[in-house]
């Protein structure tokens, strides 16, 4: 697997080796130095095989792109024939060929991940190197086997064995261990000492060592130069794959050529001219050494198995000897807990302690059989264990152990069942006794309690019901007490180990049961007597409550009526109050009788409570009222009656005086009010301009003004009467509908109307004279205005104003343009946006429309004449043509002219003129 190269290779049957490969590939990304080494090494390795087919490659990422040489390489190294390649040059032909090669690799049990034909065809160097490395692993390294180690570990062990005798060589890996070249030289010298004089090599000269090894391997061993000495020396950590590839060539060269009589061996001797006898001796020595090592290793393993058997047998037999007494013991403390503890110990023994011994016995038998088989196969005599440790001895001891286990377990289960039955009976006794004692807790104290002597009647009845329920419960518990006694008797019969405590507890329960019966009867008698006394007191309390509640309500109502702070405004009201008070006084006799009955009920209850000494007997549960409260309220009511008589008499005199003031005010107001209304109607008629000229209207208005001021003393006299009415707090007067406020408002409105109408008439005269309109025109305008002033308010709403204009012949369209024109007219007649049009504004607008008036355009034309048709005017021209004060007025208010061709001091008369008529922002 190669993460940085983007591929994963795995072979079936070599999972351990491929897992190691995965670990190698996790170290990091493929750096440029390693990539360069791999490219050079893999290219040389491929060429070493391709030359057998008469071809080679120059650039590994390009020459395999069409897939042809890749398929040829696989055929050479596998000795098998691949499918016929596609000969086209199109991309899909190349992909098809590469896929055939990849399929062949996969058929050899190699799992390819992330390696696709497209990457190889595209010349992806990392993918190509990864693919070649996968091929090298499968066809050059995987089959290496040294002492049950395969692939990388086998190749590394082979290197270590071969180089062990050599100085300065310590092969631990496939990168740094080969960096100085001595390991390569040692491998060659070990197999071909005639090719290298190892004693002359130095660790301090790695370049010479590497060149020597590579040259000798290429010249005499037919191993091409796959590594560059400079790259190995200058790289801190040379590429492991490149070195493994090169070292695997050494392995195949030496292992394939070492067999005497083999064709490669004979050809090799022929090429080198060396002695055949020399290599036979060399091979024989190595074979003899290997045979001795193998025999010694077998003998050592057999001795180890014998020692282990003796140790395991002794340990197992000793454990059985220690365990048997415990299994044969039948001692018990006759308690269920003790037997259950023994049973749990036995289960722990079966669960934790025995399983390892079962495994130990099985291992012992397996080791014995294995040992005997190995001895037989190696022609050794059979193994005889020491006395008492034969397999049969162990089997017999084991059977005895299992028999003891079975008997011990059966005894434990039987004893457990017996004690469980007895313990169940004891637990049943305990449970029933506990339940009974829990039920009886507090019962004696409850029955001896005198709590009912401090109870009210309802509480006492509840206690009596509760006691009746307890008596029923007591009768129901009689069966439980009998069951407890029966169980105790049975435990005694069965000789329960703790019978003493059972009997003592049973006796306590029976004694307590007798006491509870006596106390129950005594408490019932006490409850009955207390109920009789409280019922008698309760009847008195109930009667008191029935009478006291309505009487108390009557007292509260009477007291409220007597102290009521009444407010009256008429004689009828005060007379009604006096009549109601007289009726109340007539009921006081019956009330006094009821009061005496109520107080008598309380005294009777007090006598019984004192005689029977009933705690809390004076507390009435039916009411919160008391005799003292009723007595106090009755005394208060009797004292308030004469006070109420005096208050009503005083109020009667006050109302008689108020009636006189009402009549005086009404007489005067009924005269003033109509007079003000008549004057207001006359002034309004004049203001409407219905008849007469403006001068006549003005004359009549001034006459009315004099008459109104002459009537003012009557108003002042009415104010004095009103002041007296206010001081007497009189707010209503049935003799007149006029109030002082309405008369004041009417008087002020009259004065205001006269002044306003005088001002309007004077303004109309001024407008008529200045505009030159005739009396007929003025009358027409007034008539139209009055016609649409439906409410006679002296003003028109916008819609009324619009209708008035239309009636006078003013054209206003009903389209959007007409609405815009009307809004402009409204802005003129109602500049403050009050929502109404006064007659003065209406008249001013109509006179503008019907007469020739000055406009902003006329003023602009006049200024243009003074300025000689220029768009601006100079201050000197204004001073020359206008009076001095008016000239200075214009100069101060005219803005500077900012148009084209302006000269210093030029003034803008156009903006000034439009501002005079409110048509600009100036």
Swiss-Prot record:
For this record, the Gene Ontology CC terms, alphabetical, are: cell junction; cell projection; cortical actin cytoskeleton; plasma membrane; Z disc
Q: Give every Calponin-homology (CH) domain span.
A: 36-140, 149-255
Functional note: F-actin cross-linking protein which is thought to anchor actin to a variety of intracellular structures. This is a bundling protein.
- UniProt keywords, alphabetically: Actin-binding, Calcium, Metal-binding, Repeat
Family statement = Belongs to the alpha-actinin family.
Pfam families recorded for this chain? CH, EFhand_Ca_insen, Spectrin
Q: Which GO terms describe its biological process?
A: actin cytoskeleton organization; muscle cell development
What is the protein name for this chain? Alpha-actinin, sarcomeric
Which sites bind Ca(2+)?
Answer: 789, 791, 793, 795, 800
Residue ranges crossing the lipid bilayer per the database entry: none
Q: Which PROSITE patterns match?
A: ACTININ_1, ACTININ_2, CH, EF_HAND_1, EF_HAND_2
Location of the region described as Actin-binding in the Swiss-Prot/TrEMBL record = 1-252
Q: Which InterPro entries match?
A: Actinin_actin-bd_CS, CH_dom, CH_dom_sf, EF-hand-dom_pair, EF-hand_Ca_insen, EF_Hand_1_Ca_BS, EF_hand_dom, Spectrin/alpha-actinin
Q: Name one GO molecular function term.
A: calcium ion binding
Renumbered ranges of Spectrin repeats? 253-393, 394-508, 509-629, 630-742
Q: Which domain of life is it from?
A: Eukaryota
Summarize the subunit comment.
Homodimer; antiparallel.
The EF-hand domain is annotated at: 776-811, 817-852
